[in-house]
UniProtKB/Swiss-Prot annotation:
The lineage of its organism: Eukaryota, Metazoa, Chordata, Craniata, Vertebrata. Keywords: Amidation, Amphibian defense peptide, Antibiotic, Antimicrobial, Immunity, Innate immunity, Membrane, Secreted, Target cell membrane, Target membrane. This is Alyteserin-2c. The modification Leucine amide is found at residue 17. It comes from the Eukaryota. It is found in: Secreted; Target cell membrane. Shows more potent growth inhibitory activity against the Gram-positive bacteria S.aureus (MIC=50 uM) than against the Gram-negative bacteria E.coli (MIC=150 uM). Has a weak hemolytic activity against human erythrocytes (LC(50)=135 uM). One of its GO terms (cellular component) is extracellular region. Its main location: secreted. Belongs to the frog skin active peptide (FSAP) family. Alyteserin-2 subfamily. Expressed by the skin glands.
Amino acid sequence: ILGAILPLVSGLLSSKL
């Protein structure tokens, strides 16, 4: 599960940046 959440968080951070 964490493995699927990490990429999601990275995507959100990239979108904000």
